Amino acid sequence: MAAQWTLGLVAGGTSLAVFSRQLRSPLSDFSQHVAFARAFCHGGGLPPHFLFEVLVCGLAAPVNRAGALDLAAIAITTAAVVAKVVLTFRRIREAGASAGAFFAALGLLFAMPLFNWWKFPEVYLGQVSPNVWHNPTSIVVLPLAFLLFRAASSLTPTAPPRNAAGAGALTLLAVLTKPNYVLALLPCWLAQLAERLRRGLPAGAAGWRRPALVAALLIGPAAGALAWQASRLGATGSAIAVDPLAVWRLYSPHIPVSLLLSVAFPLAVLALHFRLARRQEPLALAWSVLLVAVLQMAWLAEPGPRFTHGNFFWASYTANYLLFVESAVVLIAAPRSGRSWAAWSLLGAHALAGLVYVGRLIAGIL
């Protein structure tokens, strides 16, 4: 319990320091989303993914004072970061001792891509960062994505309907907060369910009824929400184009290196402990989701004024964080050896890059 409280205090204190700065930064998305919440509080419309704005308005409206929306945004995003680090600690502790889980979760709280040589000490733009500090919807969706990934790892095609309905509700909440991660997870999740179904399908037509119900409960609500969001975006003139690497090249002159610097720790765990890692279904799912997310990031773009926004990057950030977590789970369960210490050292290097990044955010440099 002490470890969780300590992690929560570190995460909360860091978040308060960062987010209070982000509200005043022209490079941050906080002010835009607070403006959306303010418009909603005064009877205006909502963006297609609106859960954060609704929460901000709901928390601030009873106070009805200047600055209440800003404080609500800081409170909600801080709570999300605290939830993320506590969930991370609990997941890693399932495979190892509390002390190791504590330090791993602490490192993951700050982990960012390793330093590069072409824009030192910048580590965010152009890389696949496991942590995001400037976009409130990405911050808030992370704990939901964490729970959703856990559900995806354990759900079977013959699960009780209440379990499938719970997973479907989580999927819907994630879509309404920020849909990108769900768009990368769903193909992998459905493929995993199909493979589990192939291995254990009961004989006869009756054997298909429960899997069909599970799929409907899982996909139905999210599919409806995604269709509604697509229609809203289409009405504003937004579109999707296949334009390989066009957006990514704007932010990285060395895309393969950017990718390697972003996933150095998970790659090291996979390479150094392959025999253990290959037996872990959650790790395989995490890698597959990241692959789909990176393909979306690399191939898709929004023509027009939103072209440079990189809105197809978001799924890869969330997916990479969850890959880092599952890689830490494998590593903490592995026997202590020089290989393990080498992998932990890489996580430390990722955390150091993140600490420098967070320090620059707090100092107002970024």
How should each PLM-predicted stretch be described?
Residues 32-71:
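Short hydrophobic/aromatic helix or loop-helix immediately within or flanking a transmembrane segment
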Residues 71-98, 102, 147:
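Transmembrane-helix motifs of polytopic, lipid-linked glycan transferases
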Residues 1-16, 96-105:
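Start-transfer (signal-anchor) and selected internal transmembrane alpha helices
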Residues 20-32, 41, 49-50, 68, ...:
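Transmembrane catalytic cores of multi-pass membrane glycosyltransferases
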Residues 163-179, 185-186, 190:
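Membrane-interface alpha helices of multi-pass inner-membrane proteins
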Residues 183, 305-333:
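Hydrophobic/aromatic-rich transmembrane helices and adjacent perimembrane loops
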Residues 216-219, 332-361:
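Signature aromatic-anchored transmembrane alpha helix within multi-pass, membrane-resident enzymes
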Residues 100-152, 255-260, 310-319:
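Membrane-interface micro-motifs in multi-pass membrane enzymes
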